[in-house]
């Protein structure tokens, strides 16, 4: 479990995400095997996230990934989720997300558990 995240790691994550026009990035994608990701615009920090609830209503949509350049995959995700995480100030938060935000968070959460979009569906290459 992560207790403190180096500010330089967070800056490197944010810079990499912006450089590649991403909407999320996990620490593992830049070589830091810790349970941390950024998601959204402006990016929010998610430390030790846990998905507490997932809606039974799901939706399939296209996803891309900084780890799979040029690949696009149709992925089924829950439309709404409830997440528990710690922010960069060390505050534990429980919050619901839906739609696109929920999709991005589930995508980044997958990275923390060793999954890529290519594990979730048929790959369409650009």
Regions found by a protein language model. Name each.
Residues 1-126:
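Positively charged
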């Amino acid at each position: 479990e992560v207790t403190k995240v180096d500010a330089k790691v967070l800056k490197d994550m944010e810079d990499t995400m912006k450089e590649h026009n991403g909407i999320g990035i996990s620490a593992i994608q830049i070589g830091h095997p810790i349970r941390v990701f950024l998601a959204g615009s402006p990016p929010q920090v998610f430390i030790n996230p846990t998905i507490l609830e997932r809606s039974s209503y799901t939706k399939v949509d296209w996803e891309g990934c900084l780890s799979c350049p040029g690949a696009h995959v149709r992925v089924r995700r829950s439309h709404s989720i409830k997440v528990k995480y710690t922010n960069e100030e060390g505050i534990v938060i429980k919050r619901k997300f839906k739609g696109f935000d929920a999709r991005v968070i589930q995508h980044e959460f997958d990275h923390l558990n060793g999954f890529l979009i290519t594990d979730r569906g048929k790959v369409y290459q650009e």
